[in-house]
């Protein structure tokens, strides 16, 4: 079975596009086309593909069939997933056992948390639970089992929603099928069996309990509320303590990604792992340790789409480095997307998934164009200026591809994002390294009193840095014209903006190639290296 032309260079990219199209078709026809039809279509097309491959004929037809098989498989996966979430509600109280899988959030009159039902009619599903009398729930933490009796109901999505944000889609991504209000006398803590939960979910639950312990130790230090909330969000993905004011500050400054675990945070942790392993990172043992630590961290912080994408990308990168093969960024990104969508096709509509992949795609496409010019190469070898120029290029590339989505979902356009990123990214790197050191030293405080003093001193220092960063971001967010709010766009405008971006990037790339051919500019990485060496010699 052969791929022809440029298909060999971007195999997974084309497959990912076909999978995405298939998922969209399956979702649009979910009510009209049964799951069985998509299943049999997938089996039939796959059988035909195998027959053509064995006969070694019609290679172009084989390529076309591969794409059709992928599309049919995507439609099959999404329709099966959506059917599994459909539940009927009786309107009567039901007895069930469940386990707490998200950090409880205190509301005005209740406490909200996410439950995974392990026994009862909705066993295997998740639901949003609202507990009466929140003051009595201080002891409820992630991993606790409960036995309750309440009425399950659907969600009311008739209220107006600004922008393109769809709460129904977001619940579908998380597998939440119902909501329930639990009276104070209708539940109790209980030892529940987790056999109904998949093994990966049980492992994630155990690691999230460890995450809660780390958060408790951090909360016990003398940190301000905003400092604690910022560190918890940056390191362990817990945003429950982030106030509306702090969230608004980061949004207006254009650095909301700092509070959401993504490639930036996992990249810092990956660099830390590589530094600790040293030369052994390129061995089989080093590769296994790296993959184990990366995915353990991803499970511990909740497996959000952004962190899963980052973990998959760094896994591919580590594997390619070990095999000493070229690291094809576009193919690796497409491979990560395909694996994630096959595992959970509804993730396609997750806002974090979309923004994460588009940001990386922007970096993949535009950062290469930005760095392939003499200005970048002239300063790339300089330690401080080179890193600053690289940071600006990455921020511009990511913002270009993410901005239309931000306008579509949130109606916010930050104008000082470059300045904010120059401030936030280096400080975030320091904060994550220091926070990880805090987590490692925390257990040692039980054995030596002087270690407690050192730990508190270090925590105070980290808290001071976080406070200064938050202050600087507040100043940036308060500058005149820092952001434009209420700039919502429609789905059609969103599509047209991305068409325009792709067209501009194409023209930019074509113009750069024409300029290179006319002026004899460098075209290869070897030429870039020669120019860097020449720049160093001239400077010396």
Predicted regions and their residues:
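Alpha-helical transmembrane segments of multi-pass integral membrane proteins
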Residues: 361-481
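Membrane-interface helix/helix-cap signal primarily in integral membrane proteins
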Residues: 2-5, 58, 62-257, 485-486
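Hydrophobic alpha-helical transmembrane segments
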Residues: 10-16, 202-204, 208, 235-240, ...
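Hydrophobic alpha-helical transmembrane segments in multi-pass membrane proteins
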Residues: 14, 22, 57-64, 180, ...
